[in-house]
């Protein structure tokens, strides 16, 4: 799925993983000094694309994909969630309320999700449709740097919320 990723409570499937437990997740450190992994080319301009299939509706809002930008307090994130009423939800910044809630997902149908960061502009797409975008803050005069990606449970969401999603064909592009 991803170079140097940590997989927790997930089942390997062709070209990816199936997440089925409350704490199932895949954490991919991209620019974390502790891991001695610095992908400088990914700092301010990237596109992450993945195929996802939601097997069944969750009982609440469930994280699908999170990008953590910079190791700052508070942490700045870009999130895609899926809801019990088959909606997509985005949360940009470190907000507790959704930035947008729109579009619908279908159980057992493959969807294409994308997170983009171009300079200080963050965008979220599902199946080619823009779900949300915003300006991300600058640190000094430069944009925040990409820190890590996470699919599923990332330790900051409700650990009792089960995830029933398959993530495959993850691609990361330098823009």
UniProtKB/Swiss-Prot annotation:
Domain of life, per lineage: Eukaryota
InterPro entries assigned to the protein according to its UniProt record, in alphabetical order: ConA-like_dom_sf (IPR013320), Sialidase_trypan (IPR008377), TS_C (IPR055239)
Annotated catalysed reactions: Hydrolysis of alpha-(2->3)-, alpha-(2->6)-, alpha-(2->8)- glycosidic linkages of terminal sialic acid residues in oligosaccharides, glycoproteins, glycolipids, colominic acid and synthetic substrates
A Pfam family this chain is assigned to: TS_C
Gene3D superfamilies per UniProt: 2.60.120.200
Molecular function via GO: exo-alpha-sialidase activity
EC number(s) reported in the record: 3.2.1.18
Keywords attached to this entry: Glycosidase, Hydrolase, Repeat
Entry keyword Repeat: yes
Function text: Developmentally regulated neuraminidase implicated in parasite invasion of cells. May contribute to the pathology during T.cruzi infection by cleaving sialic acid from cells of the immune system.
Note: The parasite mammalian stage surface antigen exhibits extensive antigenic diversity.
Protein family (similarity comment): Belongs to the glycosyl hydrolase 33 family.
This protein's name: Sialidase 85-1.3
Lineage, top ranks: Eukaryota, Discoba, Euglenozoa, Kinetoplastea, Metakinetoplastina
């Amino acid at each position: 799925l991803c170079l140097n990723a940590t997989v927790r409570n997930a089942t390997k499937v062709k070209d990816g993983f199936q997440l089925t437990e409350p704490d199932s997740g895949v954490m991919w450190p991209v620019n974390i000094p502790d891991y001695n992994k610095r992908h400088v080319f990914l700092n301010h301009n990237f596109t992450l694309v993945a195929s996802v299939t939601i097997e069944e509706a969750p009982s609440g809002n469930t994280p699908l994909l999170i990008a953590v930008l910079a190791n700052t307090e508070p942490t700045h994130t870009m999130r895609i969630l899926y809801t019990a009423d088959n909606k997509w939800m985005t949360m940009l910044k470190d907000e507790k309320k959704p930035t947008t809630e729109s579009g619908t997902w279908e159980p057992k149908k493959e969807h294409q999700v994308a997170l983009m960061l171009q300079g200080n502009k963050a965008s979220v797409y599902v199946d080619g449709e823009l779900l949300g975008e915003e300006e991300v803050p600058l640190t000094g005069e430069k944009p925040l740097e990409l820190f890590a990606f996470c699919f599923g449970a990332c330790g900051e969401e409700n650990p009792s919320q089960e995830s029933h999603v398959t993530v495959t064909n993850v691609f990361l592009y330098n823009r």
